[in-house]
Amino acid sequence: MSVSDELFAEALKVMPGGVSSPVRAYRSVGGTPRFVKRALGSHIVDVDDKRYVDLVCSWGPMIAGHAHPEVVAAVLQAVADSTSFGAPSEVELRLAQAVVARMGGAIDKVRFTCSGTEAVMTAARLARGITKRPLLVKFVGCYHGHSDSFLVSAGSGVASLGLPDSPGVPKEVAGDTVALPYGRIDMVEELFAERGDQVAAIVTEGVPANMGVIVPPEGFNRRLHDIAHAHGALLIQDEVLTGFRLSPTGAWGLQGAKEGWTPDLFTFGKVIGGGMPLAAVGGSAQLMDYLAPEGPVYQAGTLSGNPAACAAGLATLALMDDAAYSRLDATADRVSAMADAALESAGVPHRINKVSNLFSVFLTDAPVTDFASASKQDTKAFSRFFHAALDAGLWLAPSGFEAWFCSTALDDDDLEVIDAGLHKAAQAAAQGLSSLEDVRR
């Protein structure tokens, strides 16, 4: 029995599912989750001292790699003064200034929270408070955290009220969220024609990445902006995952900044916290000043703007200049090409969706454009692929519905390990369970 096996058995006794977030439990791929004891640069080391090349990056935040010396120094300096003040701090101000400056005029102010869930929840409350309307429009497969308003799935018909996607979410709450198939601008138009005067906001990921990466249809986000504004609603662009990762200005920098439109509100997370609990809502001064204490829409948090998290985020953003993004994009190009070549060589049907340095590998022979098509991938083949990759020293997300993340810490030696590991994983996906241990069935 491995140390991870022993720790997981203990964890199951005191933590639901043995984890603090469901995907970590390996339920979709089988087997025992590996417990991590340290990470440095592009590598993860588990409690059994096995080393992996990291292609998860803590689900996105570790864009400059783990334990980068400049980030570590900034955090140590911050915690030496205290782990929390519960009061304004200079580092909080400097991070706010950096986020606003990087967005190039798209936002004037930010409000920090501790998680992406809180950030989107705050943005939704703000939109409802400003418009005095109840409805939110989201898209099936887009994840905006686990607040009650967003744990819904679409019913049949364009204007179907949301149904709770989790026990504990009252139907009355879910009923104020309408979930539509992603990419169907015709259904958005139909909904607004019928109920546009009730909609507070459309909430969308700039690039969906929580059902796997989905490439937005040409002009889709701009049309969402235009439709919302034509009916007096707001557009909330959730960039918790994509913000400051896809480009210096996130997904918006690849789309809206070039096309001449701007969402009303943004949400950020992951990268801006440098791996620590931090997220934010951003927008124009006119909208953001509806938040207390300037305005009537309430939001608060004891640890919001935590100095250690702000220090980590500020140091991380400072590392990500234009050259760093160019290097990151080039690395992602190479890794995605390796995955494509390995699966092609093994004869495994697959599709790779990619935007900038973010991509997903779907084991299916059909285009993946929304949650319905993503759900048709071969999850059993992915389980074989995942475990063979893990054995070969690759740290992948334990689900076929996730993005692959690269960091600037990946080097040529890492890429050789990745290439070899992906070929082994592809062969396992093609051959079935015969080459795997029984525990992984």
From Swiss-Prot:
The record's section on SUPFAM superfamilies has: PLP-dependent transferases (SSF53383)
Q: In which pathway does it act?
A: Porphyrin-containing compound metabolism; protoporphyrin-IX biosynthesis; 5-aminolevulinate from L-glutamyl-tRNA(Glu): step 2/2
Q: Which Gene Ontology terms of cellular component type are present?
A: cytoplasm
PROSITE patterns referenced in this protein's UniProt entry, alphabetically:
AA_TRANSFER_CLASS_3 (PS00600)
The catalytic activity of this protein is classed by the Enzyme Commission as 5.4.3.8
Q: Which keywords fit this entry according to its UniProt record?
A: Cytoplasm, Isomerase, Porphyrin biosynthesis, Pyridoxal phosphate
Using the UniProt record, name the top-level EC class of this enzyme in a single word: isomerase
A Pfam entry, by short name: Aminotran_3
Keyword Cytoplasm tagged: yes
Location of this chain's protein in the cell:
Cytoplasm
Its chief place of residence is cytoplasm
Catalytic reaction annotation: (S)-4-amino-5-oxopentanoate = 5-aminolevulinate
HAMAP family in the record: HemL_aminotrans_3
Oligomeric and partner information = Homodimer.
User: What name is this protein filed under?
Assistant: Glutamate-1-semialdehyde 2,1-aminomutase
> Which organism does this sequence originate in?
Propionibacterium freudenreichii subsp. freudenreichii
Which gene carries the instructions for this protein?
hemL
